[in-house]
Every structure is written in structure tokens, then in C-alpha cells.
Amino acid sequence: TSLSRMCDAARAAAAAQGMDRHHFAVLQCPMNLYEAGALVTPNTGVDQQETVLEVAQREGIAVLVNRPLNAMPTNKSGVLRLADFPIEGDPVDFDQQCRTVAALEEEYRKAIAPALQDSGEGMAPADFFTWAVELTRVRPQIQGLEHWEQIEHQMIAPHVNQVMQALSRHLTGTAAEQWEAWRDRYVPQLLTLLRGLRREATERSRAKTTSVSAALDPLLPEARRRESLSRKALWVLASTPGVTCVLNGMRSRDYVEDSLAIMG
């Protein structure tokens, strides 16, 4: 969308109403260290030779930039979080932990699944717990922490919770006791496996953001180089001529405190 054409349309609409000035005053667009088209790509103005920020300054349009910390370097690369990623917890031997989970899941298929009625629709009871296989398949595809959190929160957790609750409701007697004893052994082992994958995903994200900081630091004042990557990314945007406001979603106290530092 051409900003200059939008301004022309606003002026035409105002003139059609007998008004001297239009009410088009604010533009919002994504911008971050990777997606800087508003600053560097001439695609609007006279002969399409001006950038969005240049036209915005000339026309008196306020520019709000969003996604300052969630970059999409390419269409296929997914989201790159421009923030530091502290490594939490101890490393997990994935192969060994996967074998432990696989053994428990095989025990479920032999001892518990046969007691469950198969409706013939949807997933068979024997396939309710196959995370050792699924996580082994998914592991090489994990791009980073943001990607892993999507997998964990949207695919793994909903399925596991739904199945756990359903079996706890429907099994009774000896079968229920057997299920509960197995569940109490299985859940901690599955969580350990998930924690190991989370750490691996964090390490992948950290490798990417470390390279970003290394490229960015020589361009920053020395006093800024010791700050977090998220602060550096926000400072760059907030200091860019033509950017009126940087919109940053802050879902925790730590996010707020980190972001407030750039206002000092």
C-alpha cells in the first residue's frame, strides 16, 4: 500500500466534503532490525522514490511501529525473537529420556489401552500416548524457543490434558487404579523430556540472537552495548527519524522493566 496514494485519497475525500484538511493522521506498520522496509525501501512518493518514513515526515503523519521484537527475516524462517534467552535448568540426555518415555508408553499400550473402548472414530486409545515417536520426529524441525512454545502450547499440552482428563473420568475400579499409577510415573518423565527440548530450543534461539548482537554492537554507543538485545532493538527503532511510537506488547513485569529503560 502506497502511503502517498493514501494521502492523496485522504485529500480527495476531504475536498469532496468541502474540507480544507483531511483527518488521516496516523499510520501503523511492522518494523524491526530485520524488517526495515519503512526506512530503507523506496516504494512511495514521487515516482515511487521515497520511503514510507520520508513521506510520513513530509505529510505530518505519525508512524506507530509494531512487532519491534518479533522479526520475520524471511517468509519461511518463522519468528525470530529479538531478546536475550537465559538458559534454564540442567541439560537432558534426549535419547535416554526418550527411551524412558517410550517404555512407559509401550506399557500403557499393553496394560491400559486394551481396557478402553475404541469408538472407531478419531484416534485409537493405543495411540493416545506416542510422544516418544512424535517428539523425535519434531525435534530437528524446531527453529527456536518461540517455535517450540507454539508446538508445546498448541499441539502437545491441549492433547495431553484432554486425554488425561478423559481417562480419569471414564476409568473405574482396578483399571482406574492402574491408570493413575501409570500416569503418576509417566507425567514427570514426559515433562523432563519436554524441558530438555525447551532447553535445546532456547540454545538455538540464543545462537541466532548472539549473532544479531555481534553485528549490531559496533554500530551502537559503547554504553549501550552491554544492554539486553531487546533494549538495543527498541532503542534503534525509537531513535529512527520519522518513527513516532514503538508499540511493544509486554506480558510480564520483567518485560515492562526491560522496556522502560529506553525511556530514561
What residues fall within each predicted segment?
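Beta/alpha (TIM)-barrel catalytic core signal, keyed to glycine-rich beta->alpha loops juxtaposed to Asp/Glu
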Residues: T1-G264
